[in-house]
Amino acid sequence: MSAASILVGYTADEAGADALAVAGRVAAATGAGVEVVLVLPSEARNSSVPADAGYERFLRERSRSWLADASGRLGTDVATKLHLRYAESSAEGLIDAAHEFGAALIVVGTARGGILGRSRIGSVADALLHSSDVPVLLAPAGSEASSDEGVTRITAAVGTRPGADALLESAVRLARSASAPLRLLSLVPIDLPAGLDAELAALTSTVHAEDVLDEARRALPVDLDASVETADGSSIEGAVRALDWHPGEVVLVGSSRLAAPRRLFLGSTAAKMLRELPVPMIVVPRTTRT
């Protein structure tokens, strides 16, 4: 990630401040630059309304003021570029900008209304999580207050479904770039079909967890600081709450098997994790972009 940029989908509110804070942490840790993008509705979308030159000028000036404020929040230690874009939708504008800049990551904040430090998906994040071919990072509410923690650990939530290779590759790259340890987390014991006999489920869970972690560990570079851990709980939410989370940690999850190739699709397991995670989550496409 150090050779690429990080794109922030900026909004002039608390969610935008959270996105900037997390992007700044990741950029400082990896050496990446930050592209701050504010997307306004395109003229085509508002073609039924007569153009008001005065209002459009006011909106442009206000938007540039918001972008200048965003740059000030990031400080001088991070290379920052500011962009005002027009698009039919915010998600479309962010994805197009990410392609143009070669961004390795799109960072957006989450909607308010949930427990502080937890994430509730807003409309822009939801659209990105079901269409983007660029990894998307969701900054939990309250991230602005903990912006000086750096990147202290990378956790990759691995499973048995297709897409694990892309997830591991992304996790290893980020861990190396940030000089952070990597934790492999197995959610297999609680990611099994409903209706299984309890004893059989327990046995199957244990065997699968060991196999998944062994296979993932073998795929890691020998010189990488890595650990493995198995989630323990009767539900995804309970297991996530019981796990140890470091300040400055970042979690990576893969896309659902329903995702189109090279696209994101937030699966049910990741969605359940997201509701309880106190740290940022990156959702990785089934296959990464080259």
Question: What label would you give each PLM region?
Answer:
Residues A53-S65, A201-D211:
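A short acidic, glycine-rich active-site loop
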Residues L105-A127, V151, V250-E276, T290:
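Glycine-rich, Arg-bearing micro-motifs that act as flexible, cationic patches
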Residues V107-T110, P135-G142, M281-P285:
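Short beta-strand elements of ligand-binding domains
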Residues M1-A53, T152-A202, R218-S227, G248, ...:
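Small/aliphatic-rich secondary-structure junction motif
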Residues E35-V37, K81-R85, L137, R183-L185, ...:
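General small-molecule cofactor/ligand-binding pocket signal
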Residues M1-S2, A15, G72-I106, L220-V251, ...:
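Structural beta-alpha unit
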Residues G24, A68, G72, I95, ...:
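Active-site phosphate/pyrophosphate- and oxyanion-stabilizing loops and adjacent acidic/basic residues
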Residues S143-T152:
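Intrinsically disordered, low-complexity Ser/Thr-rich linker and spacer segments
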